C-alpha cells in the first residue's frame, strides 16, 4: 500500500477510536512478518508485540507499524476476524511437528499414541485472543512450546505419566491466553515457555 493510500485509510477513521481484538491481531501478524524479514530485531519485535496487544486505540497501533511496509489498519465491518479452523494433530506410531510461522486456530487437539509431537507457538500467528488446546498422550510424548508473553492456564491430569501443570514466568496483560487441558496415560505432556531465537 502506498503512503498516500495509508494516509487515506487513516483519515477514513477516528484515530482515537477504540481498536478491536481483530485490529490488534492484524498488527501482531504484521510485526511477525517484519521480524521474519529481518526488519525488526527480536527485542524490538517482542516489545512491539506486547504493546500491540495492550493498545486500545487505532493511534497506538499505527505508531507500532509506522516505520514498516504493509497495509494500514482500517475500521472493520462486524468486528470479527476469520479464525483458522479447528485442527487435529495426530501421532500414531509416528510423530508430528508444527513449527515456524503458521495460523493458530481457536481450538486445537493434539494426540500421541506410541508416538511423539512438538507444537511450537513461538513464531505462530494467533487468530484469536483465546486458544483452547486439548492435549492427550497415551504411551507417547508431546511438547508444547510457548512464547514468553502469552498467558497460560493448565488443567491436565496424569495416570502413570506426566502432565506439566505450571510454566515458569508470567504472561503479559492483554496478550492472548492459551488454555491447555487433557491427560496422559503412561505418557507425557510437556509445556514450556521458551525464548525465541535471535535472527542470525
Curated annotation (Swiss-Prot):
Induction: Highly up-regulated during the early stages of invasion of the human blood-brain barrier. Residues 1-21 are annotated as: Disordered. This is Uncharacterized protein Rv0966c. Pfam families: DUF1707. Residues 7-21 have a biased composition (Basic and acidic residues). InterPro entries: DUF1707_SHOCT-like (IPR012551). It comes from the Bacteria. GO terms for cellular component: plasma membrane.
